Amino acid sequence: MILKLYNTRTKDFSELTNFENVKVYACGPTVYNYAHIGNFRTYIFGDLLIKTLRFLGYKVNYAMNITDIGHLTGDLDDGEDKVAKTAREKGLTVYEISEFFTEAFFNDCRKLNIVYPDKVLVASKHIPIMIEVVKILEEKKITYFSNGNVYFDTSCFKSYGEMAGIDLIDKDMTLPRVDVDKFKRNKTDFVLWFTNSKFKDQEMKWDSPWGFGYPSWHLECAAMNLEYFKDALDIHLGGVDHIGVHHINEIAIAECFLNKKWCDVFVHGEFLIMDYNKMSKSRGNFITVKDLEDQNFSPLDFRYLCLTSHYRNQLKFSLDNLQASKIARENLINKLSYFYESLDPVDLNTLNKDLKNFGFSVEKEYYDSFVEKISFDLNVAQGLALLWEIIKSDNLSFVSKLRLAFIFDEIMSLNLREEILKNLQNHDVVIDENMKALIEERRIAKCEKNFKRADEIRDFFAKKGFVLVDTKEGTKVKRG
């Protein structure tokens, strides 16, 4: 089935009709601190997109950048380099800071079951292409040099700012989050290359035709995209906060460099809201994955919470909401565990084979419904609701419910199969009357020192995947 996504660029839904080599780029973290769960809501949305594309049969080439230089504290053209600022405060080098927080970011991604990109593009390792892009733009007379820095002249790009709202420019207003800079020709111009840093001892600098300096955040993403994906990008991901400045600047750089349209589809995820504000490091109102773990939450409790809301809707975060998601996720695992432990060996064997080998029409109808929901703008929240409908259904067998749950989990990534097995290892198996009779026979055999018969009964259970554990309270049956 063809995936439809809401395209911020066109303000309409776009169909992805090319199933071969879908090029996807996501704005990754600026590695000066731990990523917070507001950041991870966006990365979970990106993860859902990549997994949905692959689930539907698209061949995906997925890249993410790591910003280890040039992202200023103001997110614009003012302020100090965030990584350099943290390095100075902690008495470490910028390389030590960026390496530490990059590793921390991907460790948290693993805990949240966020897919690892096919290519990770570290900004400081791609300086030559950034310089080359600026040189080409300079040759086209799209840049100017002012106060030691190279600016992009937005008046040379007639469609500048369309994705954010062209009316802002028509009214000679400043776009959201853009400050006044007396060295700019136009209010919307932005720096491509800094040689005149406001801060002494800027550690990360490179030689360039304009002097020793460093690239802007906007140049980094555009240039690395052009280097890795060449002249075409299919989908660009990011948070809604990137629309008003960063992504329109990327579009301007790339399309002036290429002399043609660059990326057709931009997809943006909404904020995670806490105390009526977006979660933000600069505001000081942020929570990390480790903070959740310290309060006895699983990172997958947070992932479940994210699955309950569409990516284009703001999601309110509170400990109460997270606790509700924790309870719901545990209830889901408990119900699926009950189904699983009730299966006979034939059904268990079926689950280990082709999951999509559906036995009857009702099962296939639920599967088709799930595919339809995720194919229309990643409506995973409706897919999760459908999973609960399946669990409560009287028209499906236990093996059908489990099969559908495991299929859905290829995208939801709640580790359902693993969590079920872990759950069953920690809980006694519900046994029927025949099993109870055999356990009692084994108890009597052991009392009568008929160890041969006792071992035969033990081996009988073992062949069915059960382990008998003798305790003071009696014999318990557990999954092997």
Swiss-Prot record:
Catalysed transformations (reactions): tRNA(Cys) + L-cysteine + ATP = L-cysteinyl-tRNA(Cys) + AMP + diphosphate
GO molecular function: ATP binding; cysteine-tRNA ligase activity; zinc ion binding
Coarse class of the protein's main subcellular location: cytoplasm
Entry's EC annotation: 6.1.1.16
Pfam families found in the cross-reference section: tRNA-synt_1e (PF01406)
One annotated GO biological process: cysteinyl-tRNA aminoacylation
Source taxon at top rank: Bacteria
Cofactors (names): Zn(2+)
Subunit structure: Monomer.
Residues annotated for ATP binding in this entry: K281
Protein name per UniProt: Cysteine--tRNA ligase
Subcellular location: Cytoplasm
Chain positions of motif 'KMSKS' region: 278-282
A cellular-component GO term for this protein: cytosol
Cofactor note: Binds 1 zinc ion per subunit.
Record's keyword terms, sorted: Aminoacyl-tRNA synthetase, ATP-binding, Cytoplasm, Ligase, Metal-binding, Nucleotide-binding, Protein biosynthesis, Zinc
Species this protein is from: Borreliella burgdorferi (strain ATCC 35210 / DSM 4680 / CIP 102532 / B31)
GTP-binding in keyword set: no
Residues that, per the record, bind Zn(2+): C27, C221, H246, E250
Family indicated by similarity: Belongs to the class-I aminoacyl-tRNA synthetase family.
